[in-house]
Amino acid sequence: MRVASAPSADNWRALQVVLILLSITAGSVDAIGFLRLGGLFIAHITGNLVILAAHLAADDEAPLANIISFPVFIVALAVTRLLAAGLERMHVTLLRPLLLLQFLLLTGSLALCVGGGSRPDLNAANAIVAGMLGVSAMAVQNALVQISLKESPSTCVMTTNTTRFVLDLGEILLGRSRNDGVKAGERAKRSGLAIAGFVVGCGLGAGCQAVIGLWSLVLPTGLALVALVIAVAAKLDGTQAHPCFAQRTTGKAASATKAGRHFDGL
């Protein structure tokens, strides 16, 4: 039985920074998209279903971007999973390539948006494609968290994070088990940081778009680049448990290995 080595504290901290940056990215691009691209939710993709329902109820014509955003998101997720499967077959770690793909998609969205002028036609092809590139970038971000950062909270949808955060606070307050309380505290910290990052991103995105319009997409694009640079510099390959938990897990695994060898010798 192979025993995994404990992750370094530096790598774990770098990963937390990447996750916070991704949360700010999602919050900012969602606010900018909603305010500047005709009510398009780029990160919180299911919000577009509410927008569509509202238009249908009012017997209004729904924007094309809102109509196609959900199918585009699903296709982008599927393509990302196929790409990840191909990288896995080549024994390539997934986090950094997926962060690069996200950055490139956001860059494409930024280029199309600013190329359309200060007041782009939201029904024009370039504006719609720009929005869908943003949606695809958030699909990649959602996928990389699920595939490569499995122990991490969502960086795009905060409802689950808020639920987890409050439940973990309840677990800490109940104090039924010291070990469970420590784990709940660690989960609450990660969920809380993701929530805070998203809220900060929403505020920054809303503020920037009010001043510089669609040039504000430089913010999420730049944050995605910083996250990629950190991941490359720290050689991050995916999620890792907090070092103290990893050491406990490693110790348990080593004990199990010794026990297995003992029984094999009987």
Describe the function of each predicted region.
Residues 2-252, 262-266:
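Alpha-helical transmembrane segments of multi-pass membrane proteins
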